[in-house]
Amino acid sequence: MLNASPLQTLDPQVFSAISEELARQQSHIELIASENFTYPAVMEAQGSVLTNKYAEGYPAKRWYGGCEFVDKVEVLAIERAKKLFGAEHANVQPHSGAQANTAVYAAVLQPGDKVLGMNLSHGGHLTHGNPANFSGKLYQFCQYGVREDNGLIDYDELAATADREKPKMITVGASAYSRIIDFARMGEIARGVGAYLFADIAHIAGLVAAGAHPSPVPHADFVSTTTHKTLRGPRGGLVLCKAAHAKALDSAVFPGTQGGPLMHIIAAKAVCFGECLKPEFKAYSEQIVKNSKALAAAFLSRGYKIVSGGTDNHLFLVDLRTKYPELTAKKAQETLDLANITCNKNTVPFETRSPFQASGIRLGTPAVTTRGFREAHMADIADCIDSVLAAIGTEREAVVVAATKKRVTTLTSRFPLPYQL
């Protein structure tokens, strides 16, 4: 027999932990650039009976029977994704962004092939060739980065590296780069050396979909993204590609790197894409950028250094060394968390510290924008952060942290989250 008791009764320990996390999310200012608050309808789809169904294969080409209704859901997700991004082909089955990237590599590369990707410490991602990651172990990566004087991608140097190394693929995309990426130029560079162009837009996908950032789709052979972050969907992955690569990509996802798809998550992706196609999503994405620019300006006015000097998207990287040379990002992150401000330590380009200590904090505005924060609130947030950082290591630290926490909870109480247990 199946125990149909509610979670609170069936497993009070798990229920308690979830309740505590809900309270944390409600009372904290969330500035981690990769986090957001999803739609209740997305959560409803994730918790649906579709979690019970195995559906290896693709719509109308399954290895199991009884897939006629999950087929409807996957077709909806595919068609909405294609429409949202103007893509020729979409695969909605990847379980995550890393799984999506794994499939792209597997579709057209062989182990040992050369790939040109962005250095992690300059704003790239683990799956773009970091030696600790599968990508760096399976493929021969050479890397490009940003200029030390201005924090911007040097496209001329990148082109020279591509011409010298002759990679089979060039990967473009970042997890901590705050400026517009010139996908058209990247396409020219890739075509010039006969390489595939693979754009990982996990961080900026929502901005791209809404027209708040140029799209890589016309220029890239493959485009991957997560479906959370700026898209506000479930945690999952998505790959877009040219029709010519569709068969290779689909085979690389299943059976190449995955088995059964998560149909409840695919349903949630369909809901997310449907919401992103509405006019309100464009306004939301534009507000993310407005808030990010306002928050960056508030930090600059307080004497902080921002890598690249500002932002064009949803995030930016504060280099703490200019104002607080002895303060590590690890200490800053931990102390801000005590004041109910959540962010993450991050290496900065040409970092001199260990990544476990780091010199930068990465700040993003998707989550606070979802809650309803606007430009005027960004000065308040910057003031809270500045107060805490200035007090670290002084006799005032505990008092300032407590006062800031009270100020933050007062602010967040004005913007309640739409969730109930």
Swiss-Prot record:
It catalyses: (6R)-5,10-methylene-5,6,7,8-tetrahydrofolate + glycine + H2O = (6S)-5,6,7,8-tetrahydrofolate + L-serine. The keyword rRNA-binding does not apply. GO terms for cellular component: cytosol. Keywords: Amino-acid biosynthesis, Cytoplasm, One-carbon metabolism, Pyridoxal phosphate, Transferase. Pathway: One-carbon metabolism; tetrahydrofolate interconversion; Amino-acid biosynthesis; glycine biosynthesis; glycine from L-serine: step 1/1. SUPFAM superfamilies: PLP-dependent transferases. GO terms for molecular function: glycine hydroxymethyltransferase activity; pyridoxal phosphate binding. Disulfide bonds: none annotated. Its EC number is 2.1.2.1. The keyword Cytoplasm applies. The modification N6-(pyridoxal phosphate)lysine is found at K229. GO terms for biological process: glycine biosynthetic process from serine; tetrahydrofolate interconversion. The record marks H228 as: Plays an important role in substrate specificity. Catalyzes the reversible interconversion of serine and glycine with tetrahydrofolate (THF) serving as the one-carbon carrier. This reaction serves as the major source of one-carbon groups required for the biosynthesis of purines, thymidylate, methionine, and other important biomolecules. Also exhibits THF-independent aldolase activity toward beta-hydroxyamino acids, producing glycine and aldehydes, via a retro-aldol mechanism. This is Serine hydroxymethyltransferase.
